[in-house]
């Protein structure tokens, strides 16, 4: 399933982690999945499976910041997640500002499907899409 120039994104949360895949060529992304985390501990086997299947050249992890750009309590956990992903799997991992990605994902899902579309997994995977598309716009090459 891997294609040259594929990029994977993660929207890290303490209960759920959204995942998206995208392409540099088209600068587009689509949701892949969301999976549960236990108090911020991800299912590393699930991540390994996704990385082996898609073989992304880069992994983008959304970095939660306050609106003024300062860090929040979750920021350190996201940095730890990104560092562990790099250490475990040897993939290139970059952090990207994710401010308002969940708000934007919820609004888009609601617009397309009302309240029924606002399932947690869909919101998290949708947030990963927004994070990835934002990163692709900022770093197209």
UniProtKB/Swiss-Prot annotation:
Q: List all membrane-crossing ranges.
A: none
Molecular function (GO) terms for this protein are: nuclease activity
Instruction: Report the subcellular localization.
Output: Cytoplasm
Q: Which InterPro entries match?
A: RNaseH-like_sf, YqgF, YqgF/RNaseH-like_dom, YqgF/RNaseH-like_dom_sf
Give the matching Pfam families.
RuvX
Q: Which GO terms describe its biological process?
A: rRNA 5'-end processing
Record-linked SMART domains: YqgFc (SM00732)
Q: What is this protein called?
A: Putative pre-16S rRNA nuclease
The protein's organism comes out as Sodalis glossinidius (strain morsitans)
Q: What are the leading ranks of the lineage?
A: Bacteria, Pseudomonadati, Pseudomonadota, Gammaproteobacteria, Enterobacterales
Instruction: Name the gene.
Output: yqgF
